[in-house]
Amino acid sequence: MILISAWATGCASLPANTGRTQSTAFNAPDSTALGQLVQARRAQVNARADSAFHLLDSVDSAFSSRLALIENAQRSLDLQYYAVHADASTEVLLQRLRDAARRGVKVRLLLDDFNTVGQDAQVLLLQFEPNVEIRLFNPLTGSRASLVSRVLGSLHDVSRIQKRMHNKLFIADNALGITGGRNLGDAYFGTAEKSNFVDLDVLAWGRVVRDMSASFDRYWNDELAYPVQTLLSPDDLKALRERATAPPPGNDPSRTGVPPATPIPPPAAAPVSATATVLPGVSPTAALTQSQHRPPLNLQRVTLTWAPSLLMVDKPDKVGPGDEEADAGDTVVDGLLALMRGAPQDILIVSPYFVPGAEMMKTFADVRARGVRIRVLTNSLASNDAPAAHAGYARYRRDLLALGIELYEMRATEQTAGGLAGSGSGSRGMGLGSGVGGSKAGASRASLHSKAAII
């Protein structure tokens, strides 16, 4: 029976992607409160650069900054993620996104389709809110009840489905945006019970955010980005819609009139409803606890570094069928290698899944011959959440050491991770990722998830 099922699902194919319309980012950011705040903060320091940055190196700042962008958005919120997990922290963020949409903010959510299965498929319920549009990138076929069945149903197209969209963007009004290593879920914000990620993001202001939005638009309008309603069956749509539109068991304050956004209000924890859940499987009490302890970041007072900037992004067709990414010169890795070749003194790499490959090893050999110091921090086997990636790294370990490269592998305890990076919103430590010392998980397992190259 298993073999017959696998053969039958193997014949599944994607529908024609004819239901999508082209759309682009909001094009007048300076007319919004966030855009005006960017200009005001720049004028305060008479900055020559037109982009600014704030490192989000703690779980608290990572969560509160996303809340601040949602709370202060007036025209648009564009989110692009590899994974959005249906848990308490996501419930808080989705409630705020829903409320923003109800006050007239246009929300576009682009997700890689690999993880929208099981409980995490509940995230798609947001599609049925006004002003919300969700697209799924590089989708798999088959039921969302099981990842196994979806993989089996796509085995005939394995060259395509094994390439995933790992971009992570969170953009408000095309004026402020967050990018970095974090997906959305408890493990990325230090509140998962069993395992948390040590991670790193940056909050960007100004012109560079336009580049981030342009990248979002390229993926959003790509032929591999499918509107949710193109992929879900009529029965799936009916079930999701019934769940999404069912009246809550009590009064739902979020369904009453919500006032329009005011220009950058002082940080305050907006109420999270204990009944009007977006994710039916998440405990309302857990979401309420998250909200009460993490108010939005104060955007008026956050420290900023104004500096020239360059955004490097892989093209969407890197994810498509075939080997388009083999064309040199147009990937993020190509850009990073070019920067490394010009390093005069020191290279520091933080990577959770460090598998250098032949071209990077050649670059390392060349710069080491010039006396450039190279240090690499990656996961140990114990801390790695992707053992296959560690196996790939282990094959290069002896050769890396022979080049004189200094290798550091993170241990798997939260105490180590907290000591490495600091747990408070103002603590930097070595600045290599977000501390998880504030997690409710105590001594639970920690895994490095930060991605950074310092040259």
Regions found by a protein language model. Give the residues of each.
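Bacterial N-terminal signal peptides
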Residues: M1-A8
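Charged, low-complexity intrinsically disordered terminal segments
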Residues: G10-K168, A172-I455
